[in-house]
């Protein structure tokens, strides 16, 4: 290279794999509302891309099926087809390949702590201010469903809550929403 010119380093293939994985991770957590512990416990066989659903083992070993929207299906399909095999190849070859859906850079199952790192980086990169946690995404999922008209019972089922009382935490409606519903629904408003 000529003097005074900086050369850019070639792109790191491992970083590209991580980016694909991280996008799938964040999108899956927000798009399904599952707990971070449930997310990192997913195996490849828990994802059914054809039916657009994920089988989740929740608290108390209770299984539930959560639908996936098309954007998540495509992101997961790409991650599973392109990035995951290369990450899995990094694992110890003397053992059977890992079955975990999400793998770290060494080909081992991603941990809860590893997910926190991913989420912090994603929040910083997208300019999100404040403290973002995996539960922030779960809370956003539930709140957006309720504001979109989903029933409390359906949200309870999707979140894997044992009681409706737990789900009611997400029903904090704004004053404007309450007034709007009142004015549109009450015959004398």
Give the location of each predicted region.
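Conserved catalytic core of the tyrosine transesterase superfamily
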Residues: 1-189
């Amino acid at each position: 290279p000529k003097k005074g010119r900086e050369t850019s380093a070639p792109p790191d293939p491992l970083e590209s794999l991580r980016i694909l994985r991280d996008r799938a991770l964040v999108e899956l957590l927000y798009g399904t509302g599952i707990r971070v512990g449930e997310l990192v416990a997913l195996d490849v066989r828990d994802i059914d891309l054809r039916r657009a659903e994920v089988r989740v083992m929740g608290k108390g070993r209770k299984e539930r099926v959560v639908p996936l929207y098309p954007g998540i299906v495509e992101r997961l399909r790409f991650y599973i087809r392109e990035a995951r095999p290369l990450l899995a190849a990094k694992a110890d070859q003397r053992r059977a390949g890992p079955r975990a859906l999400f793998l770290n850079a060494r080909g081992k199952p991603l941990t809860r702590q590893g997910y926190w790192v991913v989420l912090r980086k994603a929040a910083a990169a997208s300019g999100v201010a404040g403290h973002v946690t995996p539960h922030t995404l779960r809370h956003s999922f539930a709140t957006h469903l309720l504001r979109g008209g989903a029933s409390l019972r359906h949200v309870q089922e999707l979140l894997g809550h044992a009681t409706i009382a737990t789900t009611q935490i997400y029903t904090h409606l704004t004053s404007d929403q309450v007034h709007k519903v009142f004015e549109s629904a009450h015959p004398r408003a």
